[in-house]
């Protein structure tokens, strides 16, 4: 869709967040919009008085518009090249680009790079994109073109890991090349990453600094990594002197990847338990000085969190009942490293 884009007008006084450069426009702030707008259409946002506030992607949802620019622009290849160039320059500034010890990094992190609804992860010479909204998905071909330009054609595979519902008419997920996996380095450790079959874009890149932080506390400890996936935290623990590491995950595919990562890093004293985490915790007789608990999203929405809470209980009781057991499988002076996403709002 080229200029001119359909126009959406805000209610009086609702432009304050936009003037403060917040990219989300909620549906309740809209006063007037064309009747035939479809999910993913590009729109020009106007104030109540008709002042141009920005250009964004429209959706019939609570977040009605996600702004990609705070001016009137055309979302052509020049726009995308500039956005991706800015993102790459930032990664160069923090020494992630052409880093021999870390060959995987997040190039685009949604709102943080001014591209709400888009994730792009780089694995060596491969790029995996993930569109979280239909409007971004509709730009995937031009995003791939811009990636090729910004990286001077050095990206050999571009894979689209967006949700299945966005794809129509047997569209290919491969926008360039056909590689399904890669062996990458992160802070000197080697990992097998499979974006074709794996979770998210193949590896939880956003946990890189947490993995490095964890390595400061593992020396000579017995470590358990729950919901271990491909063993990212386990490798860091092993290579920083842990006495032993147990990884637990119900996925046999994750078990294969984790064991492969152990071999890639010449690590020892590791055992993978392919079973339900809570069953394992009830049955294990081991004692651990350091727990890593990075579970899947049990409840992404606040109402789901409320429904998961029984009267008088806490998340600690629900997710980690063995911590309150009379059998101390977490050492009394042990460390619990956990990462939970609960969304926003208050929980009664």
State what each model feature region is:
Residues 67-75, 128-137:
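Short histidine-centered catalytic/ligand-binding loop motif
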């Amino acid at each position: 869709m080229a200029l001119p884009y359909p126009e959406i007008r805000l209610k009086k006084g609702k432009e304050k967040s936009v003037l403060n450069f917040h990219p989300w426009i909620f549906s309740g702030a809209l006063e007037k919009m064309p009747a035939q707008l479809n999910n993913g259409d590009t729109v020009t946002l106007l104030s109540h008085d008709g002042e141009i506030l920005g250009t964004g992607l429209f959706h019939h949802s609570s977040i009605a518009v996600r702004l990609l620019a705070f001016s009137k622009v055309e979302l052509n290849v020049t726009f995308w090249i500039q956005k991706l160039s800015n993102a790459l320059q930032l990664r160069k500034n923090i020494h992630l680009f052409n880093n021999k010890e870390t060959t995987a990094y997040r190039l685009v992190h949604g709102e943080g790079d001014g591209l709400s609804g888009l994730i792009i992860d780089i694995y060596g010479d491969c790029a995996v994109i993930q569109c979280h909204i239909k409007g971004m998905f509709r730009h995937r071909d031009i995003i791939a073109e811009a990636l090729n330009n910004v990286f001077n054609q050095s990206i050999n595979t571009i894979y689209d890991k967006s949700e299945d519902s966005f794809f129509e008419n047997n569209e290919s997920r491969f926008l360039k090349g056909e590689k399904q996996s890669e062996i990458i380095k992160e802070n000197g450790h080697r990992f097998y990453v499979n974006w074709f079959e794996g979770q998210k874009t193949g590896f939880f890149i956003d946990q890189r600094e947490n993995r490095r932080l964890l390595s400061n506390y593992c020396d000579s400890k017995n470590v358990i990594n729950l919901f271990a996936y491909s063993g990212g935290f386990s490798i860091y623990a092993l290579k920083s002197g842990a006495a032993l590491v147990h990884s637990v995950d119900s996925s046999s595919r994750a078990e294969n990847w984790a064991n492969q990562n152990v071999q890639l890093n010449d690590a020892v004293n590791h055992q993978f338990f392919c079973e339900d985490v809570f069953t394992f915790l009830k049955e294990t007789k081991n004692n651990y000085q350091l727990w890593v608990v990075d579970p899947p999203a049990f409840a992404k929405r606040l109402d789901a969190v409320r429904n998961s809470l029984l009267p008088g209980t806490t998340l600690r009781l629900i997710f980690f009942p063995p911590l309150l057991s009379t059998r101390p499988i977490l050492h009394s002076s042990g460390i619990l490293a956990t990462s939970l996403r609960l969304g926003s709002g208050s929980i009664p």
